[in-house]
Regions:
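A surface/extracellular/periplasmic glyco- and lipid-processing/surface-interacting theme
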Residues: 180
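Hydrophobic core of alpha-helical transmembrane segments in multi-pass integral membrane proteins
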Residues: 50-55, 75-82
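Transmembrane alpha-helical segments and their cytosolic interface motifs
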Residues: 36-52
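Transmembrane-cytosolic junction motif
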Residues: 79-104
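Amphipathic coiled-coil alpha-helices
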Residues: 30-33, 37, 72, 88, ...
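Charged, low-complexity intrinsically disordered regions
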Residues: 102, 106-108, 118-176, 184-339
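Cytosolic juxtamembrane N-terminal segments of multi-pass membrane proteins
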Residues: 1-41
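Hydrophobic alpha-helical transmembrane segments
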Residues: 45, 58-77
Length: 339
């Protein structure tokens, strides 16, 4: 973790403990309620239904195998319990986060807000650094996807201003839906992970794309040319492309103006902080969109069978929050001159 975040660590721990102490009784009641809900009411009928369903004979089943159906009934019930636990636990965590995160984030700045994914559809369909919504047009104009965005399903959304830089951070799943004339459709996952939108004061006219290198070559849009830097450590991990313009050298010049050694070091630092495999970025019209691909569920608390007052939770949360805010702090995106 960068040293620039050390000044927040102690205040974060104190605030976490304070909020925990104030809310612990009601959170324990909430925890007990969700645990009990696993075995009561409609959930119980769901398990019984799953159990009995497995005993139904198949259409082409000639010889009824009781042992097989007993095995299947047990497996289906286990699967049903897992589904119910996942849904119930998610509801429990979201309720805790709604009361914890808004207060906890004030450690980093008074203007930072949190919105749970369950409240996402109450937001307007516009980019707004206060409402915390990244519109589909921003994703599409970034040119980081080869298909248009049809849906995005955020889990956690953070927005506001940090170090004079407006930002939106959205843990989300982005999907493209292809519809056919017969009424059928196919869904394609375009992205799963953390999307971060930052407003930059430094203006560049060119469109710049950054891709982390992997086993397969990145698919780059037409009319983009590669930019090579003298920093070999960065070149080994990333490919940078700039959109060609009528002024042939302008894109290359602007990319080199933006990508000084400090910028490249900090960009690599963000990649390693979240321990993700793929990362891509679009810099366009005064905004920077960073996509960190990961299947890990970030910004999460302990599940409902663990202690709510486990103070070790704050360490994980602090590391994840600090990784993002340190990126803003060290990149100095609010600067109009240097990075």
């Amino acid at each position: 973790m960068p040293e620039c975040m050390d000044k927040y660590k102690n205040d974060f721990a104190i605030e976490f403990a304070k909020i925990m102490q104030e809310n612990l009784p009601q959170w324990k009641t909430l925890q007990k309620k969700h645990i009990n809900a696993l075995w009561k009411g409609e959930k119980l009928f769901w398990y019984i239904g799953c159990f009995l369903f497995a005993y139904l004979p198949g259409k082409r089943e000639l010889n009824y195998d009781l042992n097989f159906h007993i095995f299947m009934s047990i497996m289906i019930v286990i699967f049903g319990i897992i589904i119910v636990f996942f849904c119930e636990n998610k509801d429990y965590q979201n309720e805790i986060k709604k009361s914890l995160f808004p207060k906890l984030l004030k450690v980093f700045g008074k203007d930072i807000e949190y919105v749970a994914g369950s409240d996402f559809y109450e937001l307007s369909n516009k980019v707004n650094y206060r409402s915390g919504y990244i519109s589909h047009s921003i994703y599409d104009n970034s040119m980081l996807f080869n298909k248009p965005v049809s849906y995005d399903s955020p889990d956690d959304i953070f927005s506001g201003t940090f170090k004079n830089c407006p930002f939106i951070i959205s843990e989300t799943n982005i999907t493209n839906v292809k519809r056919y004339n017969n009424g059928k459709s196919d869904s394609f996952t375009l992205f799963n992970g953390i999307a971060m939108l930052f407003k930059m004061q430094k203006k560049i006219k060119s469109h710049v794309l950054i891709y982390s290198k992997g086993l397969f070559k990145n698919k780059v849009p037409k009319d983009f040319e590669k930019v090579e830097f003298e920093y070999e450590k960065f070149n080994k991990k990333y490919d940078v492309y700039v959109q060609k313009s009528q002024m042939e050298a302008r894109g290359q010049i602007e990319a080199r103006y933006l990508f000084n050694t400090a910028f490249m070091d900090r960009f690599m630092q963000l990649h390693t902080s979240f321990k993700i495999s793929k990362m891509k970025c679009s810099i366009y019209k005064g905004s920077m969109l960073v996509l960190l691909a990961t299947n890990k569920d970030l910004f999460e608390l302990n599940n409902m069978f663990y202690r709510i007052d486990d103070m070790n939770q704050y360490k994980k949360l602090f590391d994840e929050f600090a990784s993002v805010f340190s990126f803003l702090e060290v990149l100095n995106l609010s600067s109009k001159t240097g990075l």
